[in-house]
C-alpha cells in the first residue's frame, strides 16, 4: 500500500489548538464524490474563528487547496454544492458567506453582512443587512417577522438560523452563539 506524507506547517500564529477528537475531518468538500482531508488549525483571533487545512483527494494522492483554509467556521451544503462560512466581525457585526469550488479553488459567491448602524438615533439600535455590499434591509424599516422572512427562517433566501449553516467543528450556529460551544 502506498503512503503519502503530508507536511503541514502552522501559519498565521496564535491558534488555540483543538483536541485530537475534533482535529480531522474526512468529507467531500469539492463535490466530486470523493472524501477529502481537513485538518483543523484551531481557534484564531479574538472572535475565535476556526479554519482548516484542506487536502483534496486526487488520483495521485492528496493536493492542498489553500483557498479553503481562508474560509472561517466552514459548513458543507452538499445539496447546493456550496461551502458556507459564518463569523463575527466584531461585537456588533456578523457575516455569512457562500463559496463555490471552481477548479479546486474556493471562490466567494456572495456574502451577507449584519452591522449596527453607527449613525442611527442613539435611543434605538438599528441593524443593517447587506449582500455583497448592497443594502437589503434595515431593522428600523422592517418588522421582526419581515426580518426573519428575509434572512433567518429556513425558507428565506439565506436561512441563517437553519441546519445547512451548522459548522463542521461543533455543528454550531452564529445566530444562537452555539458556534462557540465545545463539541
Map each language-model feature to its residues.
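N-terminal "first-domain core" detector
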Residues: 1, 17-31
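Short beta-strand segments
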Residues: 4-6, 53, 95-97
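Beta-propeller fold detector
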Residues: 6-8, 64-69, 108-113
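Repeat-based blade/solenoid architectures
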Residues: 8-23, 68-78, 92-93
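Acidic/hydrophobic-patterned starts of short beta strands in beta-sheet-rich repeat architectures
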Residues: 29-41, 79-87
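Short glycine/acidic-enriched loop and turn motifs that connect beta-strands
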Residues: 43-46, 90-91
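Beta-propeller blade repeat segments, especially FG-GAP/WD-type strand-to-loop junctions
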Residues: 47-66, 98-103
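Acidic, small-residue rich beta-repeat scaffolds with periodic aromatic anchors
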Residues: 80-183
Amino acid at each position: 500500500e502506498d503512503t503519502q506524507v503530508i507536511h503541514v506547517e502552522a501559519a498565521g500564529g496564535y491558534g488555540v489548538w483543538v483536541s485530537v477528537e475534533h482535529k480531522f475531518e474526512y468529507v467531500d468538500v469539492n463535490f466530486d464524490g470523493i472524501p477529502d482531508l481537513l485538518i483543523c488549525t484551531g481557534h484564531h483571533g479574538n472572535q475565535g474563528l476556526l479554519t482548516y487545512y484542506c487536502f483534496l483527494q486526487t488520483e495521485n494522492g492528496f493536493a492542498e487547496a489553500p483557498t479553503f483554509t481562508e474560509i472561517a467556521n466552514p459548513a458543507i451544503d452538499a445539496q447546493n454544492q456550496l461551502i458556507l462560512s459564518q463569523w463575527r466581525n466584531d461585537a456588533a457585526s456578523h457575516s455569512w458567506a457562500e463559496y463555490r469550488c471552481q477548479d479546486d479553488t474556493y471562490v466567494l459567491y456572495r456574502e451577507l453582512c449584519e452591522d449596527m448602524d453607527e449613525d442611527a438615533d442613539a435611543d434605538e439600535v438599528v441593524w443593517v443587512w447587506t449582500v455583497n455590499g448592497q443594502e437589503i434591509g434595515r431593522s428600523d424599516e422592517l418588522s421582526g417577522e419581515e426580518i426573519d422572512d428575509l434572512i433567518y427562517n429556513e425558507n428565506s433566501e439565506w436561512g441563517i438560523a437553519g441546519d445547512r449553516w451548522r459548522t463542521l467543528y461543533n455543528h454550531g450556529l452564529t445566530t444562537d452563539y452555539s458556534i462557540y460551544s465545545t463539541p
